[in-house]
């Protein structure tokens, strides 16, 4: 069913563009270009990096599931904002794992030698790609279930404590 509360925004190479309804509800503020519709807000042909959709009526996971059901073959859809029904869509195959794989390969680092940390669904592919994928204890249930291990929560500096432990050199 069509959800008339959905509003749209876009992250481009030139900045943020979104509908007035999207920016009125945004918890984050940035310099944006807003108009009645996203089409009106986007001047000409900009390199859209990410299309954003926001719902006022669906829970974040339900909105993501609905978006994936409708758009799965067209875009990579995910979400990264806890408690906000904000779906982030990009070209298929564009996600953190792809960028991390490219970066690691450019430096001759094998996936088995990579440790990745994540807390939200937008980190899932990255955790699956890395040799050691660790979820933050305060993270999304899907990451906690898929990770190789769990580190302390964000409020407990879980990532920092784990990095410090991993970098310790043997004393003997």
Predicted feature locations:
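Anion (oxyanion) recognition and catalysis
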Residues: 1-2, 144
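Conserved acidic, metal-coordinating active-site core of Asp-based
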Residues: 2-117, 121-122
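Mg2+-dependent phosphoryl-transfer enzymes with acidic/Ser/Thr/Gly-rich catalytic loops
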Residues: 89-172
């Amino acid at each position: 069913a069509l959800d008339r509360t959905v509003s749209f925004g876009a992250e481009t190479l030139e900045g943020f563009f979104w509908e007035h309804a999207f920016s009125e509800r945004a918890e984050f503020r940035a310099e944006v270009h807003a108009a009645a519709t996203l089409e009106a807000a986007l001047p000409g042909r900009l390199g859209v990096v990410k299309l954003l959709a926001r719902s006022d009526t669906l829970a974040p996971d339900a909105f993501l599931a609905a978006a994936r059901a409708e758009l799965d073959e067209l875009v990579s859809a995910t979400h990264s904002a806890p408690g906000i029904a904000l779906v982030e869509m990009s070209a298929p195959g564009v996600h953190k794992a792809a960028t991390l794989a490219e970066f690691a390969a450019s430096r001759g680092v094998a996936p088995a030698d990579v440790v990745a940390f994540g807390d939200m669904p937008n980190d899932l592919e990255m955790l699956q790609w890395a040799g050691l994928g660790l979820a933050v204890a305060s993270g999304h249930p899907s990451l906690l279930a898929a990770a190789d291990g769990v580190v302390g929560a964000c409020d407990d500096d879980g990532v920092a404590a784990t990095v410090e432990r991993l970098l310790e050199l043997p004393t003997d």
